[in-house]
A protein has these predicted regions:
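Short beta-strand element of Class I
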Residues: 29-31
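C-terminal catalytic/substrate-binding lobe primarily of soluble NAD(P)-dependent oxidoreductases
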Residues: 152-398
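Rossmann-fold NAD(P)-binding glycine/threonine-rich loop
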Residues: 103-130
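Helix N-cap at the beta1-alpha1 junction of Rossmann-like dinucleotide-binding domains, i.e.
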Residues: 36-38
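Conserved Rossmann-fold cofactor-binding substructure of NAD(P)-dependent oxidoreductases
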Residues: 58-71, 80, 84
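Rossmann-fold cofactor-recognition segment
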Residues: 47-60
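Hydrophobic/small residue at the entry helix of a nucleotide-binding pocket
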Residues: 12
């Protein structure tokens, strides 16, 4: 049994806290910390105040160090903002504690995310005898594990992957994002990159559109190609992959609003002066959009996130589709959050279980696909995210 410190009390933090509390056999003590302690206290109240709460500025290494020394966890689960990954990693190094996150580092002033900043910590974590597990959400995270499963069990050589993320839910709002609006809009407006024949190919944001027929009654939906961080680590650690693409569904309504917001400058991340004050338009937009946490009781429908992997098996072309279906209303009933937060938070807890039980262990900085996928998936299903495998069959080449 081990103590865990969770940093971040948004929608994902709420899920992580609830799911850790369901596994007291692993997480004997839980502390939830955020810049706004009232958010932590509200989540604690949902759990009959059976957890500790604390205030911390995750941009401030000395504050983080003081909190970690006080709470003495064996693991820090970082579900704060991607801008804060490095300060939390620094604090873990200073205090000798293992680290886990769900999204890679991104500088505040540049809409660019990549693993180079965090991979640079490899020698420091290894030298300290510590483990850092990066991207233990769903995508990245479970999608990496699905790719590793395809390589281990279904294909002798994985040559192509399509990671496909569908939110077939509806919240009834004119325009809202299902997670932090600032992070979401920065992500979807960034130039698209995909991996092909040993190099990154850049195209316009959401410029490539296809249709995909999703299972479990969801049916055909439009999907758009975009860049997503797990491709960077997957093609590094599974070098047989010649082509890797990431696709996501967006409604026409979402795209229409996004285009207008871009055209009028509201997605800018640089400062502008207004009434003698400097503001960042995208941060102002975040303040006026619905809080993603408020969408839980409004959201109905399902998500479907998975990987279509193609390659060779016994010298013949073969493909496998590995995916999960998650229901928004069922998630809200269980933990008070919609499926977007649930599908990120549950894998973070499972990653923590892998680390604390020694099923996944190493010294240094690791991505999910570097470990055996099966122990992770054996825990993920009972924790609420079962895996479906369709081995063979016809799936369109995207």
């Amino acid at each position: 049994m081990s103590k865990v410190l969770i940093i971040g009390a948004g929608g994902v933090g709420q899920v992580v806290t609830h799911k850790c509390a369901q596994r007291r056999d692993i997480f004997s003590g839980i502390t939830l910390a955020s810049r706004t302690k009232a958010k932590c206290d509200a989540i604690a109240a949902q759990l009959n105040n059976s957890i500790n709460t604390a205030q911390v500025n995750a941009d401030n290494v000395p504050e983080l160090v003081a909190l970690i020394k006080k709470e003495q966890p064996k693991l820090v689960i970082n579900v704060a903002l991607p801008y804060q990954d490095l300060t939390i990693m620094d604090a873990c190094l200073e205090t000798g504690v293992d680290y886990l996150d769900t999204a890679n580092y991104e500088p505040r002033d540049t809409a660019k995310f990549e693993y180079s900043w965090q991979w640079a910590y490899q020698d420091r974590f290894k030298g300290a005898g510590l483990m850092a597990l990066l991207g233990s959400g769903f995508d990245p995270g479970v999608t990496n594990v699905y790719t590793a499963l395809a390589a281990k069990k279904y294909l002798d050589e994985v040559q192509e992957i399509d990671i496909i993320d569908a939110n077939a839910g509806s919240h009834g709002q004119p325009f809202a994002t299902n997670f932090n609006p600032e992070i979401n809009i920065r992500e979807v407006t960034a130039p698209c990159r995909h991996w092909e024949n040993g190099q990154w190919v850049e195209t316009g944001a959401l410029a490539t559109k296809r249709s995909f027929d999703f299972p479990d009654g969801i049916g055909p939906m439009n999907i758009y190609r975009m860049y997503h961080e797990e491709m960077e680590s997957i093609v590094k650690h599974i070098p047989t992959i010649k082509k890797a693409q990431f696709w996501m569904t967006f409604s026409d309504n979402y795209l229409k609003h996004l285009e207008v917001l871009q055209n009028v400058g509201m997605t800018r991340i640089d400062e502008v002066e207004y009434n003698g004050q400097k503001i960042v338009p995208l941060q102002f937009l975040k303040a006026v959009l619905p809080d993603p946490g408020s969408l839980g009781p409004l959201t109905k429908g399902k998500t479907c996130i998975g990987v279509v992997a193609r390659g060779l098996k016994d010298g013949k072309r073969r493909q496998v589709y590995i995916y999960n279906i998650c229901d928004h209303e069922a998630c809200y009933k269980e933990v008070g959050s919609q499926a977007i937060s649930y599908t990120t938070g549950v894998p973070a807890v499972v990653g923590g279980i892998m680390m604390l039980t020694g099923k996944w262990r190493g010294e240094g900085v690791f991505n999910m696909e570097q470990f055996d996928p099966e122990p992770f998936l054996e825990v993920l299903g009972p924790m609420g995210l079962p895996t479906v495998v369709v081995d063979g069959g016809e799936w369109p080449e995207l």
